[in-house]
């Protein structure tokens, strides 16, 4: 039987594993919430470490916390930030809606680790108490939403933005490489007027640049922190100036520019800032879905599809059809986008549940937002590295489809009129003849004028 030690809380004593830093409230949560396997996301755990370190430093600065105790709390909290204590955060997302159990998990782990650093006895709560010292000037009600904002901002800046830039650059390379390849455009999935393959890829690249702009705009409110509102937004038990000092400390720790929220009542009860930001993630997912679909459809074949693009062959595609290779990176990215669309609904419903002074769907908001950031980041890097970088144009197929298209007739419309041009296209389609043959047979245009007007290279920009 594994060794245990006895920890206590207001409900009395309880045994916890001797080699774990968590205490009584974490252990009770493990026993009371045996629901699923979705652990609290590690970026959120690390953000709680930031909260506890920043609170300790601010309490020291304001003369509330003994500097000796505060400094060792900061050391233990830094270990949480660095991921050294990840194994000591076992709780699932499905717990109290305020995130109190996870906040106490952080308080207990940091308390016991700090006691250990001072040579004391774990579980004694002496000389560092999880509530009185680690949680000083705080409530779960302001600490947990603050951690959500910190984790969201840090993950976005350090993970999502680099991944988005990586894919954008990969598309830009192809845009330049394909700039002189003229192909048939398509609207409503039907033939339209010509574009260059580079122009098509420029649309993908620009979509991601606009997505980055929307993300940056919506992230601005995420940099506003609830800390200092304590239980209901009034700031009870937090000293004057704690909120501003705390935000400055978080900025110093993370290297990002955080500020205290001007209205703590809104910050505790509403999660509009995070919902709005996830809306930008949702929009990015929609763009990625479109890009992935376009590329896999343009690469369909190899003998019976559009076949304008050759996609990298990364792995066998079928357990029954020998030699089959599938557009797996595009499929993975569209599944990620689908998950993000679902997360958007979950975050929307959760953010609407701010009853009176507190929203009590905080953990599920954190889980879905951070999952979306992680999945989008990973899939963009994977799609860039294993798909986009290896895309090659099938120029012969592109030329064949361009020359067969009846929509080149659009170039004749200014000269012979829309109705006449439409009749020529319909006749060619009905008879299985070429556009050129029917145009000349109509007597409406000479061979010389047809060859002058119907030139794909003159149809890809204003003339």
Swiss-Prot record:
PROSITE patterns: FUMARATE_LYASES. Coiled coil: none annotated. It is an enzyme of class 4 (lyase). It holds the Pfam family FumaraseC_C. Pathway: Carbohydrate metabolism; tricarboxylic acid cycle; (S)-malate from fumarate: step 1/1. The active site is at 188 (proton donor/acceptor), 318. Keywords: Cytoplasm, Lyase, Tricarboxylic acid cycle. CDD domains: Fumarase_classII. Belongs to the class-II fumarase/aspartase family. Fumarase subfamily. There are 2 substrate-binding sites: the catalytic A site, and the non-catalytic B site that may play a role in the transfer of substrate or product between the active site and the solvent. Alternatively, the B site may bind allosteric effectors. Involved in the TCA cycle. Catalyzes the stereospecific interconversion of fumarate to L-malate. This is Fumarate hydratase class II. It comes from Brucella suis biovar 1 (strain 1330).
């Amino acid at each position: 039987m594994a060794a245990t030690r006895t920890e206590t809380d207001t409900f009395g004593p309880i045994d916890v594993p001797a080699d774990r830093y968590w205490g009584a409230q974490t252990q009770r949560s493990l026993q009371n919430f045996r629901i699923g396997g979705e652990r609290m996301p590690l970026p959120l755990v690390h953000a709680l470490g930031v909260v506890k370190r920043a609170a300790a430093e601010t309490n020291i600065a304001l003369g509330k916390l003994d500097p000796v105790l505060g400094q060792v709390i900061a050391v233990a909290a830094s270990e949480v930030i660095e991921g050294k204590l990840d194994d000591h955060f076992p709780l699932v997302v499905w717990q109290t809606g305020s995130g109190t159990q996870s906040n106490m998990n952080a308080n207990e782990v940091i308390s016991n680790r700090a006691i250990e650093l001072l040579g004391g006895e774990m579980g004694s709560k002496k000389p560092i108490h999880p509530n009185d010292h680690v949680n000083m000037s705080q409530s779960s009600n302001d600490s947990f939403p603050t951690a959500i904002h910190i984790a969201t901002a840090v993950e976005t800046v350090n993970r999502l933005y680099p991944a988005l830039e990586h894919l954008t650059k990969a598309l830009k390379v192809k845009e330049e490489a394909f700039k002189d390849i003229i192909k048939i455009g398509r609207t409503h999935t039907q033939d339209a007027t010509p574009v260059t393959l580079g122009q098509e890829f420029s649309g993908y690249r620009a979509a991601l640049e606009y997505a980055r702009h929307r993300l940056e705009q919506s992230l601005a409110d995420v940099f506003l922190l609830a800390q200092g509102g304590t239980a209901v937004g009034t700031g009870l038990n937090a000293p004057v100036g704690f909120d501003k000092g705390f935000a400055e400390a978080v900025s110093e720790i993370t290297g990002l520019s955080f500020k205290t929220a001007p209205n703590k009542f809104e910050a505790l009860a509403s999660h509009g800032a995070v919902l709005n930001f996830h809306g930008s993630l949702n929009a990015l997912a929609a763009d990625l879905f479109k890009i992935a679909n376009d590329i896999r459809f343009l690469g369909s074949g190899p003998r019976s599809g559009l076949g304008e693009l050759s996609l990298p062959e990364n792995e066998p595609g079928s357990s029954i059809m020998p030699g089959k290779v599938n557009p797996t990176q595009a499929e993975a990215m569209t599944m990620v986008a689908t998950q993000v669309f679902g997360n958007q609904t979950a975050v929307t419903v959760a953010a609407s549940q701010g009853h009176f002074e507190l929203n009590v769907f905080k953990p599920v908001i954190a889980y879905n937002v951070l999952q979306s950031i992680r999945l989008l980041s990973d899939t963009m890097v994977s799609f860039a590295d294993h798909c986009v970088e290896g895309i090659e144009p099938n120029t012969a197929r592109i030329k064949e489809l361009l020359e067969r298209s009846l929509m080149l007739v659009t170039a004749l419309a200014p000269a012979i009129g829309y109705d006449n041009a439409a009749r020529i296209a319909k006749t060619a389609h009905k008879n299985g003849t070429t556009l050129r043959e029917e145009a000349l047979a109509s007597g409406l245009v000479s061979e010389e004028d047809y060859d002058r007007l119907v030139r794909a290279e003159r149809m890809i920009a204003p003339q």
